[in-house]
UniProtKB/Swiss-Prot annotation:
It holds the Pfam family RF-1. Peptide chain release factor 1 directs the termination of translation in response to the peptide chain termination codons UAG and UAA. The keyword Protein biosynthesis applies. One of its GO terms (cellular component) is cytoplasm. Keywords: Cytoplasm, Methylation, Protein biosynthesis. This is Peptide chain release factor 1. HAMAP family: Rel_fac_1. Belongs to the prokaryotic/mitochondrial release factor family.
Length: 357
């Protein structure tokens, strides 16, 4: 581990020199790339230097202890040694985590697709609850929400809603949300008070750069139509809505949120690229042996990941066996405890995998 940390620190120092070089700064694309790499290394280098300082102070205190004769001073030094040893152990654990392989998509914006599953109108209302939960979570982080498309029901639910979250490391937080979400509650229309179970499916896709995926324009068919609102009635007198089909895969994307057909085309293309990227990643992951797949969650849309139980005020995260009795706050965007626990579980898996290798 120390060899890797030394290499990282040397690389960081080299980059520090490069990004201050006027000749490098003249090439803005190259300079931005180096600045990004420099910023990514800064956290680990700062922690490594803190670790080295603590090690040096520990050795100095041990030397002082061996030479000290005063009882009170020896007790003070021993206390300092104990504190430093605890700090060093903590530093080592943090450095192990910082050295874990980074998901290349973690710092990207995300597209989130929510689709009502089993349960009819109640499932559509639950899809709307999830949409609000994610947008409230985004607000807490200062992220921006951009609606891409929505198929609303007459009672305020969503058969399907697609939106984008723009913000710092959005994918690193939201990637665990892919899968089947289940709700247990008494619908407003249920006169007997019987609890119903409904589901909604969530897919989380990282925003894709043009360099990540290339699409042949000849492989795309674009159809335009008039945007519709509740119940399917037309809300626009021009053909501004766009349906984009990727012919080789059959993937279809619709976008009607903007009044401009051009803007809807741009949005639809972004979502299409994200879906094609996800498809390619899924095919790549399928080739990995089963024992290496993440136990935190495969990201499979068919995987049941979480239950929201209204009568008990309970949220249960099935992948890590975590249950919280704070349903109302959770649905208002207070998701941090679960997301942090999922991140910790993923880190533990990666550390275990590194140990096995």
């Amino acid at each position: 581990m120390l060899d890797k940390l030394e290499f990282t620190e040397n690389k960081y120092e080299e980059l520090s020199i490069k990004i201050s070089d006027p000749s490098v700064m003249a090439n803005q694309n190259e300079w931005r790339k180096l600045c990004k790499e420099h910023a990514e290394l800064e956290t680990i280098v700062t922690k490594y230097r803190e670790y080295k300082t603590n090690k040096e102070e520990l050795e100095a205190n041990k030397e002082m202890l061996s030479e000290e004769t005063d009882k009170d001073m020896k007790e003070m030094i021993q206390e300092e040694i104990k504190t430093l040893e605890e700090s060093i152990v903590k530093d080592q654990e943090e450095l192990k985590i910082l050295l874990l392989p980074k998901d290349p998509n973690d710092d990207k914006n995300v597209f989130i697709e929510i689709r009502a599953g089993a349960g009819g109108d109640e499932a559509a209302l639950f899809a709307a609850n999830l949409f609000r939960m994610y947008t409230r979570y985004a607000e807490r982080h200062g992220w921006k929400t951009e609606l891409m498309s929505a198929n609303e029901t007459d009672i305020g639910g969503f058969k399907e809603v697609v939106f984008m979250l723009r913000g710092d490391c959005a994918y690193s937080k939201m990637k665990f949300e892919s899968g089947v979400h289940r709700v247990q509650r008494v619908p407003d229309t249920e006169s007997s008070g019987r609890i119903h179970t409904s589901t909604a499916t969530v897919a989380v896709l990282p925003e894709v750069d043009d360099v990540d995926i290339q699409i042949d324009p000849n492989d795309i068919r674009v159809d335009v139509f008039r945007a519709s609102g509740h119940g399917g009635q037309c809300v626009n007198t021009t053909d501004s809505a766009v349906r984009m089909t990727h012919i080789p895969t059959g993937i279809v994307v619709s976008c009607q949120d903007e009044k401009s057909q051009l803007k809807n085309k741009e949005k639809a293309m972004k979502v299409l690229k994200a879906r094609l990227y996800e498809k390619a990643e899924a095919e790549r992951s399928a080739s990995i042996s089963a024992d290496r797949k993440s136990q935190v969650g495969t990201g499979d849309r068919s995987e049941r990941i979480r239950t929201y139980n209204y009568p008990q005020g309970r949220v249960t995260e099935h992948r890590i066996g975590l249950t919280l009795y704070k349903l109302e706050a959770f649905l208002d965007g207070d998701m941090e405890e679960v997301i942090d626990a999922l991140i910790t579980a993923e880190q533990a898996e990666k550390m275990k995998a590194m140990g096995n290798n």
